[in-house]
């Protein structure tokens, strides 16, 4: 019941995306609608995946090995940012996320949003930020659960690997990478040769 009640915290984030649910127009009829639809999809998938982790791995630091020595599903709580930076600054990071969403919204036309790939990338970034923001508002921490690792030699059970992350983190990374690659391609694209005037 508590988890269902938590869903009400999604309303302030979902309401701005409501236009994409208007049945009188196509869901993907405009660039803004396509961006909003992708962001909504990322948000929903991210929150469902985290809810499943909390259901099947209810205890913090609990884990389930999927591929021994390579991949496991974990339940980690992160009150900071990537790589545990700014630990304990959940409120500040939530405020930064809100400011970032506002800035991104008003600067969306600078992110190649006129192209389908640009809209996809922008939607990934927006949805990823929203996914982790919901965590910070509802749970006061971000739930990380995807863990790739390798075992260290010595047989003492120690391991090393990439810090645990989630669907929202992945969406942000992929979106930012796509934006960077598109920007780089546009800057290095050959300029059209002007024909000499007669």
Task: Kindly give the residue locations of the regions a language model identified.
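Alpha-helical transmembrane bundles and membrane-interface segments of multipass inner-membrane proteins
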Residues: 6-198
